[in-house]
């Protein structure tokens, strides 16, 4: 690793549920907790509404890693959205491995509105994991090989 590589910081996109994870991130900011600033947050109504194509598009457009975070099981504002997200994520993760994307580049977690310290800890961990993988080089450019599988993942429960 040369000096330029040690200065490299990963670009991470975080899709956060409005009701829990985004509120946890907000509380972390208000509490002035320290965590890496290279995460770009996208607030979504529910983790269950995150289409797998959003994750792939983020990777295609230069993100080195993606974090999806929602409410804890049983606490979803929309009753079962986080369960749908967990099912989709499990399938998507296997598809990404199939096309050669390292599993650590895309991560899923639960964070409640009161868990500011947990949010900061997760951001530090995701950043360290993605940094250890290095810059994303091989990403999906042509979805034709997995388009059928991705459309199956997008089916609503």
Residue ranges of predicted features:
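Iron-sulfur-associated redox domains of electron-transfer enzymes in respiratory
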Residues: 1-157
């Amino acid at each position: 690793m040369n000096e330029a590589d040690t200065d490299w910081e990963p670009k991470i996109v975080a899709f956060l549920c409005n009701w829990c994870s985004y509120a946890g991130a907000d509380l972390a900011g208000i509490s002035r907790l320290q965590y890496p600033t290279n995460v770009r947050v996208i607030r979504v109504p529910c983790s269950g509404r995150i289409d797998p194509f959003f994750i792939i598009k983020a990777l295609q457009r230069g993100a080195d890693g993606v974090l999806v975070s929602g409410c804890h099981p049983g606490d979803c504002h929309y009753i079962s959205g986080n369960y749908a997200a967990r099912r989709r994520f499990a399938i998507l993760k296997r598809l990404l491995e199939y096309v050669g994307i390292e599993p650590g580049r895309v991560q899923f977690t639960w964070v409640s509105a009161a868990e500011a310290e947990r949010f900061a800890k997760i951001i530090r961990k995701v950043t360290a994991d993605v940094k250890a993988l290095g810059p994303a080089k091989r990403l999906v450019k042509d979805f034709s090989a997995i388009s059928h599988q991705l459309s199956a993942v997008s089916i609503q429960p």
